[in-house]
Amino acid sequence: MRVPFDDKMWAGRSDDGEPGDTRRVFNQIVPFDGSLRAHGDTTVVVGFGSDEGVRRNQGRTGAAHAPKELRRALAGLPAKNSMAMLADAGDVACDDGDLEGAQAELANVISEVLASGGRPLVFGGGHEVAWATYCGLVLHQHRREADESATPRKLLIINFDAHFDLRQKRPANSGTPFDQIANDCAERRVPFNYVCFGISDLGNTASLFVHAQRLGVRYALDVDMQETQLPLRLQELDLMLDEADDVYLTIDLDVLPAATAPGVSAPAALGVPLFVVEEMVRRVRGSGKLRAADIAEYNPSLDQDRRTARAAARLAYRLL
């Protein structure tokens, strides 16, 4: 179900009367109207109010309420001159258990945003959002190829996550999106170019590691994603970015340490420091190849002092 843009979700402190630039993100937001090319670089926020995939995956529900809280956390951050134009396309809600229908609806919205010249930034919701974001990218590519003699483009999927999310069990859930993507790539005879940063060796079964190897997944364990290893990880990331035409970035907040992100279904005992994730996200954004991004698994009912929301807002801010 589509939920229209609501400007009441974007509010914050006003410092009118103070000297200098006192703008905040909420001052920059405009409704998405389907025509952005004249405005240049534009990020378009889309909410995905779903935790049906989390429920199916036997996790703790509550992520369906995340989009509103993530907007709230982002709204009060300071605006900057280099910030892209920011629009909001409203939400897609899954409130009747029809996850597949909600994913198809979100894919259509993402395709519309891409066709307008915008760059979608999706606020989940469970990580089932990843299948929908990917489908939106594919749908847009199919429409481009139908309209012009477009050449196939190499898509790099970057996932910051403690888990592979390569479960093969169906129906689809928050743990299956990248297996679904792998199957779709095989059917379309295109490479499955998937890298996962922050994998926990204690959060994935041996069979998942075998399946990842079989699919050619590249990954870095959480123990190899600490601050001292950041320069090496950035070098590896640069090589991957050089090889890609387009990038889809997805962030599961359970990649962060539990102290930083308690508000997730499966908090991480170790996790990847926020500084490391943030620096790598900056590098992806700076590549000029980012086409879509999403932030998943925030559960407001489990958060403490809005720590997780604030961490998510920092990451979202780096993507603007």
UniProtKB/Swiss-Prot annotation:
InterPro entries, per the entry: HutG, Ureohydrolase, Ureohydrolase_dom_sf, Ureohydrolase_Mn_BS
Record's keyword terms, sorted: Histidine metabolism, Hydrolase, Manganese, Metal-binding
One GO MF term attached to the UniProt entry: agmatinase activity
E.C. code: 3.5.3.8
Binding site for Mn(2+) 2: 161, 163, 252, 254
Pathway the protein acts in: Amino-acid degradation; L-histidine degradation into L-glutamate; L-glutamate from N-formimidoyl-L-glutamate (hydrolase route): step 1/1
Matching PROSITE patterns: ARGINASE_1, ARGINASE_2
Reactions it catalyzes: N-formimidoyl-L-glutamate + H2O = formamide + L-glutamate
Binding site for Mn(2+) 1: 127, 161, 165, 252
Region (Disordered): 1-22
Co-factor note (free text): Binds 2 manganese ions per subunit.
Cofactor(s) this protein requires: Mn(2+)
Listed Gene3D superfamilies: Ureohydrolase domain (3.40.800.10)
GO biological process: L-histidine catabolic process to glutamate and formamide; L-histidine catabolic process to glutamate and formate; putrescine biosynthetic process from arginine, via agmatine
Known role: Catalyzes the conversion of N-formimidoyl-L-glutamate to L-glutamate and formamide.
Family: Belongs to the arginase family.
PANTHER family: ARGINASE/AGMATINASE, FORMIMIDOYLGLUTAMASE
Protein name: Formimidoylglutamase
Name of the gene: hutG
